[in-house]
Amino acid sequence: MATSARIDDLKGAAQSFAHLAQGHRPEGHNPIYGRLHNDTVAAFEEAMMSVEGGDDAVAFGSGMAAMTALLFAATQHGDHVVALRPLYGGSDHLLSDGLTGLKVKWVEAHEVAAAVNEDTALVLAETPANPTLDLVDIQSLAMAAGDVPVVIDNTFATPVLQNPLELGATMVLHSATKYIGGHGDVIGGVVVGDEEWMKQVRQIRIGTGGLLHPMAAYLLRRGLGTLPVRMEAAQTTARRLAIRLVEHEAVERVHFPEFPACDPKGLVGTQMRGPGAMVAIDVGDADKASQVMESVQLMTPAVSLGSTDTLIQHPALLTHQLMDEEAKEDAGVSLGLLRISVGLEAVEDLWNDLDQALSAR
């Protein structure tokens, strides 16, 4: 946990500093300073590299720090980026508010090939998408992008259910805060890819200071050990809830990756090894959504996801609030939409809670 490493050889330390500043791991060099390298953070990165099938990984203090560094590493001011909606609201806002200086073209998956041009630096997608849970065919997306790097936000699926690098993606992004941490008590992000890309991403982390705290890295590495068990249990419960919610009179539509409306190409079972543990429901309007969210007793009305506790939130007014109304409509982020991150509580307890909240007058 020390911030600095002892320097007994100044010339060697100078060489180490230059080595690290170029985005390399220490590899026998003095780590110099905690912003340049930390062994605990590196252990988490190595674990993520292994589970995602990449050559290297770079961890950050948050998912948005990871997204920002990735964009800085892969693009220059004025570059063209093709992005698929919906994305996490924070990512959407970063791409839309002009801060990055990028020219962003928002498209649907089938429009990517036509949208890519000689100035396109990056294609970006999230699958399952946040918050509608629509699936994107990663292999087809990579083919449509051609030589343009493809970044996939794999937060909802996790490495347990989906490995985008094996399907042609260039880099994979995670908000490690969510399923990887798994207990709602740590914030972090990580990017996985090949060595050359990760050297560039690591250089941005060094320059901007977005390093993951060692204690957070420890918690995230620990969370990876239970991720398969947690995901399997939560997914089983989510499936049972989704099936029952289809029949509830207060629910107009259920979004769940295993349902054809979210997965018309049959990607669950091929691209994904399971549907995951997220469910979204449309209850018609903001008033009803507010009533449901404020009526739950076992579930926690809160943003974030992937915890052992079941969380319910209203994307249009919370996580995706900063999107303009037209963009929300195009992305399917309606005022009646509620996103549910299913946790590890007993399925009947969760159903009873949802049923009473949906039936409240």
Identify the residue ranges that each predicted region occupies.
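Mobile, glycine-enriched helix-loop/loop "lid" segments at the mouths of ligand-binding/catalytic clefts
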Residues: 1-30, 302-303, 307-316
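Conserved N-terminal alpha-helix of the aminotransferase class I/II PLP-enzyme fold
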Residues: 11-65, 90-98
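PLP-dependent enzyme catalytic core of the Aspartate aminotransferase-like
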Residues: 55, 105, 310-361
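Conserved PLP-enzyme active-site core in the AAT-like
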Residues: 56-250, 255
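Short, conserved charged micro-motifs
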Residues: 112, 286-291, 346-352
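A common structural junction motif
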Residues: 209, 296-306, 357-361
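Short, well-ordered beta-strand elements within core beta-sheets of diverse protein domains
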Residues: 219-229, 276-284, 339-343
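Conserved small-domain helix->loop->beta segment predominantly found in fold-type I
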Residues: 239-303, 323-329
